[in-house]
Amino acid sequence: MPLLDTFKSFIQSPTESKVKQATNEDETSGATGTLMNEISILTYSPKTVREIIQVIRKRLLLGQNRRNSHRNCIQVMKTLTLVSYLMNNGSNEFIKWLKGNMILIEILEDFQVQDPRDERKAEDIQKLSRNVLGLLQDDGLLEKQRKDVIQFRSSISTPGRKSTDNSHLKLEEMRSELTRQSLEKKAKPPTTSTSLDFQRQRTRNTHEYARFSLDPLAEEDSEDTPGVAGGISKLSFRPKSSNNPFR
């Protein structure tokens, strides 16, 4: 059997392989969001959407059995989960096909199992199939739900989603940038014509010019100087040291 599966993997396309992986019988793990997102993007290609539809159709037809096995329960449940995801994120072409084949979903409203331990899974399948049918039969609700999902995906800038219109995000980014620039201008300190270095230089030069100091005034007794009365002292500058460069 593993050899047969290996042979089948060579003849099936990568798209078919992805859909089969998302709807396999492994109940320990479901399809990841990344895998379902890749499949939803592939629905926008005319070629790959046909391959996706082909695999999903075969999976849904498993529910026609009156006594479904445990394996069928797992595969049908995973297929309905993928269908629900593609209804919100897939192309209009996929939605159109789904509306034209609602009989495949309607059959699952009466899904039956052969093992009583699978009764809970059967109830989940019946409930999910009714939810899918409710959306398919209400165009307004389906359209609103798809728009809400697209808007949410746009808000988180999902890479690779070409069908997403994120023009409102670009406008918001532009507004944020203008606001940031405005705040930076307000917070920027005013510039002066004299820099701090220049002020320091001026202060340093002032100290250089003041290397010498004036000596205190000293009194000298006059010695019969003409024009000066005796006993009257006169003032003179007396340097403190001989190191004064101006002496």
From Swiss-Prot:
<protein>
    <recommendedName>
        <fullName>Epsin-4</fullName>
    </recommendedName>
</protein>
<dbReference type="GO" id="GO:0030125">
    <property type="term" value="C:clathrin vesicle coat"/>
</dbReference>
<dbReference type="InterPro" id="IPR013809">
    <property type="entry name" value="ENTH"/>
</dbReference>
<dbReference type="GO" id="GO:0072659">
    <property type="term" value="P:protein localization to plasma membrane"/>
</dbReference>
<dbReference type="GO" id="GO:0006897">
    <property type="term" value="P:endocytosis"/>
</dbReference>
<dbReference type="GO" id="GO:0005768">
    <property type="term" value="C:endosome"/>
</dbReference>
<dbReference type="GO" id="GO:0005829">
    <property type="term" value="C:cytosol"/>
</dbReference>
<dbReference type="GO" id="GO:0005886">
    <property type="term" value="C:plasma membrane"/>
</dbReference>
<feature type="modified residue" description="Phosphoserine">
    <location>
        <position position="195"/>
    </location>
</feature>
<keyword id="KW-0597">Phosphoprotein</keyword>
<dbReference type="Pfam" id="PF01417">
    <property type="entry name" value="ENTH"/>
</dbReference>
<feature type="region of interest" description="Disordered">
    <location>
        <begin position="179"/>
        <end position="247"/>
    </location>
</feature>
<dbReference type="GO" id="GO:0030276">
    <property type="term" value="F:clathrin binding"/>
</dbReference>
<dbReference type="GO" id="GO:0000147">
    <property type="term" value="P:actin cortical patch assembly"/>
</dbReference>
<dbReference type="GO" id="GO:0007015">
    <property type="term" value="P:actin filament organization"/>
</dbReference>
<dbReference type="InterPro" id="IPR008942">
    <property type="entry name" value="ENTH_VHS"/>
</dbReference>
<feature type="domain" description="ENTH">
    <location>
        <begin position="7"/>
        <end position="146"/>
    </location>
</feature>
<dbReference type="GO" id="GO:0030479">
    <property type="term" value="C:actin cortical patch"/>
</dbReference>
<dbReference type="GO" id="GO:0005543">
    <property type="term" value="F:phospholipid binding"/>
</dbReference>
